[in-house]
């Protein structure tokens, strides 16, 4: 692990202060999933906020674009949400960013869960900061990392 990490930007710090139960989502810069999975995940995040399970989401979307999501999310209560409004950071409780100061986010007391691909760097940072993880491995060492992390529980 590095000795120095980028700090939270003022915008990110303001978001973190306004939200006491933040879910941080990051799958690294080299992994992506399907339009269906991206849209289902985004819908699930909105539903979790609406049900007051969490009150904020930071999602680091390094290589994704609007084309990686369905244009509309159909929520379980029958309402529809335009994906573009979320991806343009118009949702007050979801912050989408290209680059995340990950260690600073994980080290913030309001970050309650890290949804990750389980890469070595992410796993080490999460363990160091004591942030709980939900791991969705995509390839290579991530499957083994997920098993090792699970054995620590």
Where are these regions (language model features)?
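Catalytic core of nucleotide-sugar-dependent glycosyltransferases
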Residues: 1-153
């Amino acid at each position: 692990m590095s000795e120095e990490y980028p700090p939270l930007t003022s915008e990110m710090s303001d978001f973190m202060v306004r939200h006491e139960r933040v879910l941080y989502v990051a799958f690294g810069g080299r992994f992506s999933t399907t339009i269906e999975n991206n849209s289902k995940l985004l819908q699930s995040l909105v539903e979790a906020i609406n049900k007051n399970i969490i009150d904020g989401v930071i999602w680091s979307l390094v290589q994704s674009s609007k084309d990686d999501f369905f244009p509309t999310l159909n929520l379980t209560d029958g309402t529809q949400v335009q994906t573009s409004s979320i991806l343009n950071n118009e949702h007050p409780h979801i912050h989408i960013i290209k680059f995340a100061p990950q260690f600073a986010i994980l080290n913030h007391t309001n970050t309650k869960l890290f949804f990750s691909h389980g890469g070595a760097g992410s796993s080490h940072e999460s363990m160091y900061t004591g942030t709980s993880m939900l791991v969705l491995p995509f390839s290579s060492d991530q499957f083994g990392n997920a098993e090792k992390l699970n054995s620590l529980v």
